Amino acid sequence: MGRTVVVGDIHGCYTELLELCDAVALHPDDLLVSVGDLVDRGPSPAEVVGFFRSRPNSVVVMGNHERKHVRGVLSYAQEITRLQLGAGYADAVAWMRTLPYFFENEHVRVVHAALVPGVPLDEQREEILCGSTSGEKALAGIVPTGHWHEHYTDPEPVAFGHHVTGREPLLRDGRVFGLDTGACHGWNLTALVLPGRTVHAVPAHADHWSVTRREWQLPVLRTRPWRDYTWPDLTAALSRTQDPWLDEVAAWAELLRSSLPALVAAAQALARELPDAALRAHPAAPVLFQARTGRLDEAALARRCVTPRRTLDLAAALGVPLPDLPGNQSSTP
């Protein structure tokens, strides 16, 4: 009968995962269990997900990072993973949706983040098991002092991740095993092998999260809805991050906002030239009617052109050439 091998938070560290499997001499008969957080922060989430999906005798517990993808709560790390997974992202998230919140066999209990001592696993709250923000708040109200595992007295061993314990795992009484040793931060990837309860680790090859953040900053920035931000929201988004490309975006936005006098002049000229029927059929008809009746000025146009896209669309309708978002080949004619 095979062993049970429980691996701490992998976070896209595929090379280290393979090395750890070699270090424990993983056999096809061994059950491989992940505490969750396969993805985010590391360089190879697609490979890690593919490894567990394709390997027989494998179990992945729902981590808070998988739960973020399942619920569509995408912050910077999740946006990077979405781009890394590319066309396979939706399929990967559909698979994540099927993950259990805990695992238990005759050797060990496995959760991602925490459990309430004394409560059966099938009665635990999912948000506590996976370590979501709401779950951590709820747990703090139930276990007000110390860490939950300091109050754990059940005879069954419990393995978990979520909270980085440092380069070394958290080991207590031969029953409590905290296995997140910061692989994505350049520390170690750790496994617990049962029934012997031995611990094995391999060092990370780099501070992967620092590297991944730098490498994917521009691709993530390019996915932002820059054309559809309101001007105040666009200004706020530009202020949050520094990147040379954002300097180009800021200059582009300023150019669009400064185009209002030219757009007013173009609308007034067109309103004078077009016959009534053509004006009514024109895509910029509301603006042209304002111009014809003398009610169009920069302030009135600014109330319409509240986003770059609306400004570009109006410019295209009026025949005023304006550049599209930097990095795009298209522009309004």
Positions of the model-derived regions?
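Core catalytic region of metal-dependent phosphoesterases/phosphodiesterases
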Residues: R3-V7, G12-E79
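Active-site-proximal beta-strand elements of phosphoester/diester hydrolases
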Residues: R3-H11, V108-A114, F177-L179
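Divalent metal-coordination and catalytic microenvironments
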Residues: D9, D37, F52, G63-N64, ...
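Glycine-rich phosphate-binding loop signature in dinucleotide/nucleotide-binding domains
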Residues: V24-P28, N105, Y152-D154
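Active-site neighborhood of divalent metal-dependent phosphoester bond hydrolases
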Residues: P45-V110, V116-G146
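Acidic, His/Gly-rich catalytic cores of divalent-metal-dependent hydrolytic chemistry
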Residues: E136-L139, G146-T332
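Active-site environment of divalent metal-dependent phosphoester hydrolases
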Residues: H11-E16, D40-P43, E66-R71, F103, ...
